[in-house]
Amino acid sequence: MITPPHPKAPPLSCDCHFHIFGPYDRFPLDPGRRYDPPPASVEDYLAMAEPLGLQRMVVVQASVYGTDNRVTLDAVERFGRDRARAVAVIDDRVDDVALRRLDAGGVRGIRLNLVSGNGTPEHQLDALARRIASLGWHIQIYADGDRLEQLAPCLARLPVPVMIDHLGGVRAGHGIQHAQFQALLRLMDTGRAWIKLSSYRASSTGHPWDDSAANVRALAAAAPEHCVWGTDWPHPGMDPIPGTGNLLDQFLAWVPDPAARHRILVENPARLYGFTTTDQ
C-alpha cells in the first residue's frame, strides 16, 4: 500500500515521465530490446499515482518498444486525453500522415535515447526536429552527462524545445561545479531547454538517492520556468526499486516553496504539454 506524501502535491500535478509495459499479447516487445521489463499496466499506474495526488500524466515510449508506439497511444486513450499526453519514438521512415495521427493521439514530443538505445537515431535529429516543429512538439534527450555536454551546442540550435531527462545524466557526486553540470546550466540559460527533476538515476550513492538534492535545487533556481518532475515509474532496471511516494517526498522537501512547487508540477507541464487549465 502506498502512503501518500506529506504534504501532498498540489491539484493538477503532472507526472511527466513514466512508462507502460504490456499486456504483451497485445503489445509485444521489440526484438532489438536490451532488457525485459515486467508488465506495468494502466491500472497499476493509477493505483500508484492516485494516492499521491498525481492527476495528469505524460507516458514516455520505452526503448523496449522501438518505434511501435501503440502501447503508448493506447495508454493515453485509456487515461483520457483531457489529462494524458505522450512522448513517442520515431525515425525518418515516419510520414506526415503518421505524425498527424500521433499528434491527434496526444503525442507532444519525440525521444532520443542514447543510454538504452533502440530509439530515434541521433543522426536523424536535425531532420526530425524540422519536421516536428510545425506540430509544436519538443525533443526529449536521455543521455549521460558526458554525451550531453558534447551534444549541448547542437541541441541549443534545434528549432524545437529540448527536454533533458533525469537531471541531464550528470552524476550527483560530481558536484554542481563540475564541467558537465555547468554545461547543463549553460544549455538551460539559452531558454530553449527544459529539465526533468527526476533525480534518482543521477545518484552516485544509491538508495535512498538523496545525494541529488544540490543538483535539483540548483536547476530549480536557475530555470524555474523550464523545470518539470516525473516518477520514472515503474523504475526499470533499478534495484532496489524506489518507493515512488518517497521520491515525491524528496522533491517536495528539496523544493519547499509552494509557488515553486506549483510552477514545476502544474504550470510548466501545462504549458509544455498543452493542458488547458492550471488551477482547480
Model segments located where?
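Mid-to-C-terminal alpha-helical segments outside catalytic/metal-binding sites
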Residues: 1-12, 38-56, 224-226, 240-280
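Hydrophobic faces of well-ordered beta-strands that scaffold small-molecule active sites
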Residues: 14-18, 57-60, 84-88, 110-112, ...
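Conserved, mostly hydrophobic/aromatic
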Residues: 17, 49, 72, 102, ...
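Divalent metal-dependent hydrolysis catalytic cores, especially in the metallo-beta-lactamase
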Residues: 31-64, 83-89, 107-115, 137-139
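Active-site gating/metal-coordination segments in enzymes
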Residues: 66-146, 153, 194-203
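Short, electropositive alpha-helical surface patch
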Residues: 67-84, 215-223, 247-252
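Catalytic pocket-lining loop regions of alpha/beta-barrel enzymes
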Residues: 122-229, 237
